[in-house]
């Protein structure tokens, strides 16, 4: 089992907008083998940090999901999200 953590640094004051987009898109982007998807915001981390976290049985599941085109609904939900972020990174952990 792996934990995938996508960490976004949003533009000042735009974290809530990215959270709204992600919460709308997450149910549309689920795939078999994915579980425990959630969106979190910083409390004591760098300001305007949004984290999208999910668990997958294996990394192939995750990368296959990213290789397939998004549904029109998911694409619409995330439309313009790059205008909200300054950058970010991905962390992948093996759950022991």
Feature locations, PLM:
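Short, surface-exposed ligand-recognition loops at beta-strand->loop->(often short) alpha-helix junctions
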Residues: 9-20
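Short beta-strand micro-motifs enriched in acidic
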Residues: 40-42
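Residues that cap or initiate secondary-structure elements
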Residues: 12-14, 58-60, 96
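Active-site-flanking beta-strand signature of metal-NTP-handling nucleotidyl enzymes
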Residues: 3-8
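Short hydrophobic/aromatic beta-strand micro-patches
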Residues: 9, 53-55
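Short acidic/glycine-enriched loop/turn segments that link adjacent beta-strands
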Residues: 44-48
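An amphipathic, aromatic/His-enriched active-site/gating alpha helix that lines ligand/cofactor pockets
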Residues: 20, 24-38, 55-92
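Absolute protein N-terminus
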Residues: 1-2, 96
């Amino acid at each position: 089992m792996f934990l995938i953590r996508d960490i976004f640094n949003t533009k000042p004051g735009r974290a809530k907008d990215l959270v709204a987009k992600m919460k709308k898109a997450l149910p549309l982007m689920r795939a078999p083998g994915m579980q425990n998807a959630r969106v979190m915001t910083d409390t004591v981390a760098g300001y305007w940090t949004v984290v999208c976290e999910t668990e997958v049985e294996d990394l192939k599941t995750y990368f296959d999901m990213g290789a397939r085109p998004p549904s029109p609904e998911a694409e619409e939900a995330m439309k313009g999200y790059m205008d909200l972020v300054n950058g970010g990174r991905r962390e992948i952990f093996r759950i022991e």
